[in-house]
Amino acid sequence: MGHARNGHRLFTCFCLAIGLSTIAHSASAAPATHYVDLATPFEQAALETAGQPDDARIAAVRARIDAMLPGLYPEGAGTDKRIGAALHQLSVDHEDYDRAIGDFPAALSGAIARFKRAFPGFASPLPIYLYHSLGQRDGGSDYLQPGHRHVMLFGADLIAKYHADDSLEPFLIHELFHLEHARHFADCDQLWCTLWQEALAVDATATLMPQATDHQLLLDIPSPIRAATDRRWSVALCFVAAHFDDADSAATSSALQMGGRPPDGLPDRFGYYLGLRLAQATGLDITRLSRLDNKAARPIARAALAKLMTDAAVTCAAPSIGPATMRQQTDGAPSDGR
């Protein structure tokens, strides 16, 4: 992420027996927002099978979760190994995990209430699940088989690791924005596309929470990004300009992923901070930016980057004005704020 508080009063019904949680407005009742809690059943299976052989414990988890959301954990030895490791970790320490499960309902309700100030008609287009991600994500959308089902997944284990503080609600705003933005802007492979998606998600959080810290904006994972990028600002701008329309994953990884091998001393995920600056350089508010489709967004993103480059007096070339052919993603890569 990927990697935000409160308009209307909200109440929460947390139904652990079936794993279904409902967040609804109390008085003037907008449609209820539901999420399914799969994190608690995972832990219940872990506790109930404590002391049994690993194979039996893994099978019990799979049976319990598959009955609620088939295909969440793909078949295979690699997934089984991660389930086993997660079961062991829960047997050692589950307090942070439990706290994440407990904090999630209020944080989600607060994020939705705040989000609706800018996007009053918002309702999640995807079913939302809280689950044990086996160390894979704190949040993001994904496609599950069978049936190519599109879902929104929040990982209680990585929420416990990265957002066990005042960054949880801002993080949820970041992810809610991705859902809203996807109504107008399609996933595509070029660096500028992914940079634009993450840029606007950070800008949305900054707009809705004007006093947000860099920690709340996810600009300190895995270490502080802003100052380190400012020190190499020209390098960051020239990298994005040179790879603006690159459709291979290497440039996107370098700019936006942890462990992505950023160039020339730039920090991991430097693109999140550069993207925030780029979004702000457009001079447009987040509501208007969110409604641009791919064709309309590229020239605005390109012009904002060119402005930043002019302000920084860099000598490298700006991206071409003419639109590149956009390669649409067919599967919809997960966007997780990371």
Predicted regions span which residues?
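N-terminal mature-domain "stem" immediately C-terminal to a signal peptide or N-terminal signal-anchor/transmembrane
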Residues: 29-84
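Bacterial N-terminal signal peptides that target proteins for export
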Residues: 2-14
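Small-residue-rich helix-loop
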Residues: 218-237
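Bacterial N-terminal signal peptides
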Residues: 11-23
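Pan-zinc metallopeptidase signature
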Residues: 236-327
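Acidic/His-rich structured neighborhood in mature extracellular/periplasmic domains
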Residues: 85-223
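Sec/Tat signal peptide C-region and signal peptidase I cleavage site
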Residues: 23-29
